[in-house]
Amino acid sequence: MEAISRDAVLFVNIPFVSEERPFTTGHRLVGDRAARMRYLEALRAEARAVAPETRPVVIRAVKVGGGSPSIMSPDKLGELLLDLRALFDLADDCEVSLEAVPHTVGVPSLTGWGQGKVNRVILRADSVQPEELVALDRPFDSVQVQNALLFLDKFHLGNVDVALRYGIPGQTEASLMRTLRSVAGIEPAHLTLEPLLAADEGVLDEEAQRRLYDAACERLSSYGFVQYAPGRFARDELHREEFAVALGQGAALIGLGIDARSCYHGLSYVNTSDFAVYAAHSAEPQHAVAAVAQLDEGARALLFVRNRLAFGGGFAEEDYVRACGPMSAEVARELAELERAGDVAHDGGAYRLTQQGLFAWAR
């Protein structure tokens, strides 16, 4: 098996939201300004503790995500990103991306984020249809989505990923096509399509979501977008999400924050989900880390397969052998099951996700 990757990506989990709303999944925190500031300081403390352990990896991409990280103090977010640049070995062309909700995008926020040299924004628009944003109870409207895009353009931030949802209550193929037409018309560099997986009433079922997904893929192809990984569409290779591309090429994962997951130097880690514990002990792994496990060759081989399918859409057998050695019975079994399910096609010495597989792995 080849040496452990020296490339890595860094994910910073900020699960804060302004208030509890329907149609959300995952761990979310609602806190006042003091709690948010305390969390950002805890992230900086964890980064200082973790960075020396990760060397000699080179960070190809940094992604700040989670709940609504753009509601945090823009200046403090900028300071956090500057800390990460000083503590970790970032590649010269490192992608630094931030998930943002439309109503938080403006001159103050873009100025603060700019201090941290954010060069990619993931705009979580969900939709541009007014009735669908109302159905989702989002704290912004379609006008604010348009304004956010104008501000991003004004600040010459051309690497924008517009994240949209399918499966919204009341959504139809026609309404999704209108959204895609409107968004494609502003010529974003990247589009992300994500299923609405919340258990709230009204969410479209899996069969209906599959129809919407297939129709969206066909329409985006006609607009010149290429789907390079499940739910990820780019006009050209230059604007593919480097965070995903790097994971699909075997980069290690370093996670900071509550619930963060890491996988590097042959070990996997999961951080605590307890805010009080994390805020008080983020710099102390014996308290901040809830679980740790060693990755044997079998686990690393499965991770290779799953990351390359999830973030790269597939892989060549020769790449697998180069990275992991001869295919084990466990890996062969998993791939055979995916083939039988119709999610993976094995052809010409490569395993690739089918259209059905792209839909399944986007979920």
Predicted regions span which residues?
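Local cysteine-cluster metal-coordination motifs and their immediate loop/turn environment
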Residues: 11-28
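Short, Lys/Arg-rich nucleic-acid/phosphate-binding segment
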Residues: 231-234, 347-351
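Short amphipathic alpha-helical interaction segments
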Residues: 325-340
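A short, conserved structural fragment
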Residues: 339-349
